[in-house]
Amino acid sequence: MEGECRVLSIQSHVVRGYVGNRAAMFPLQVLGFEVDAVNSVQFSNHTGYAHWKGQVLKSQELHELYEGLKVNDVNKYDYVLTGYTRDKSFLAMVVDIVRELKQQNSRLVYVCDPVMGDKWNGEGSMYVPQDLLPVYRDKVVPVADIITPNQFEAELLSGRKIHSQEEAFEVMDMLHCMGPDTVVITSSDLPSSQGSDYLIALGSQRMRKPDGSTVTQRIRMEMRKVEAVFVGTGDLFAAMLLAWTHKHPDNLKVACEKTVSAMQHVLQRTIRCAKAEAGEGQKPSPAQLELRMVQSKRDIEDPEIVVQATVL
């Protein structure tokens, strides 16, 4: 029997829908992981709806929760997973917790989605306070092992713009030098040979040989765009990448193929259901576009590969 693998996931929580911990816990549990969730916020629903209500966890409250685990000697983890955060002091507290957990378990893997912003029509903009960037760059990324920025976030962290695949890999090398051995740029506006209906994702994994030298595996994936606005996809991606890199630690190609293929199955099912609910010619609402997670259990568990990665 395989040993227990436990994840501490510090993310947002919604009562209705699938973002943050709600998007991460189910797939991780389906794939055999124990998940301990700290809810950085508790909202009625995600903020893409017309209204939402709820509470935000303060950094001191995060510290209290962690201390509770510590005094009971149950703060033993194999992975830490974090996503969207708006507060600088909360993010700094996360770093303190990760550092302490790594002192206890030097093999702990920290998976971080450095959520800061995105590009729309070629223009990048941040949707978190700007004072989070130096915390991510100088404190979070150096303790992270796997990071999943989009192109804009990779540019922010490295201080360099990406105009080509070559420049993207130069940026990823810079990010490797900052700390993480695995960097996946989850989406970019780089051109696809298959046309403008496709998004490019890039992955780079630095592996250490027994003699101390390193070898880097690089991959490229082309994914068909889905014409809808989904929320929670980045959280789902990071959780599944955690799971599949655990199961395929030296094969980023397979880990990314399984992650992205499962994502495609979830998104296609979601858009089919949303369109059917909305009715012909009607635009689906945020509630109708909530990820069909439970219905996609089999695809999450054993995804049919529908997106191939090219090793470069």
Curated annotation (Swiss-Prot):
ATP binds at D113, N150, Q151, F152, E153, T186, S187, V226, E227, A228, T233. It holds the Pfam family Phos_pyr_kin. Mg(2+) binds at D118. Homodimer. The keyword Acetylation applies. Its cofactor is Zn(2+); Mg(2+). It is found in: Cytoplasm, Cytosol. This is Pyridoxal kinase. Na(+) binds at D113, T148, T186. Signal peptide: none annotated. The modification N-acetylmethionine is found at M1. The modification Phosphoserine is found at S59, S164, S213, S285. GO terms for biological process: pyridoxal 5'-phosphate salvage; pyridoxal metabolic process; pyridoxal phosphate metabolic process; pyridoxamine metabolic process; pyridoxine metabolic process. Its EC number is 2.7.1.35. Catalyzes the phosphorylation of the dietary vitamin B6 vitamers pyridoxal (PL), pyridoxine (PN) and pyridoxamine (PM) to form pyridoxal 5'-phosphate (PLP), pyridoxine 5'-phosphate (PNP) and pyridoxamine 5'-phosphate (PMP), respectively. PLP is the active form of vitamin B6, and acts as a cofactor for over 140 different enzymatic reactions. Pyridoxal 5'-phosphate binds at T47, G234, D235. It catalyses: pyridoxal + ATP = pyridoxal 5'-phosphate + ADP + H(+); pyridoxamine + ATP = pyridoxamine 5'-phosphate + ADP + H(+); pyridoxine + ATP = pyridoxine 5'-phosphate + ADP + H(+). One of its GO terms (cellular component) is cytosol. Transmembrane segments: none annotated. Pathway: Cofactor metabolism; pyridoxal 5'-phosphate salvage; pyridoxal 5'-phosphate from pyridoxal: step 1/1; Cofactor metabolism; pyridoxal 5'-phosphate salvage; pyridoxine 5'-phosphate from pyridoxine: step 1/1; Cofactor metabolism; pyridoxal 5'-phosphate salvage; pyridoxamine 5'-phosphate from pyridoxamine: step 1/1. Pyridoxal binds at S12, T47. One of its GO terms (molecular function) is phosphotransferase activity, alcohol group as acceptor. The gene is Pdxk. It comes from Mus musculus (Mouse). Belongs to the pyridoxine kinase family. Keywords: Acetylation, ATP-binding, Cytoplasm, Kinase, Magnesium, Metal-binding, Nucleotide-binding, Phosphoprotein, Sodium, Transferase, Zinc.
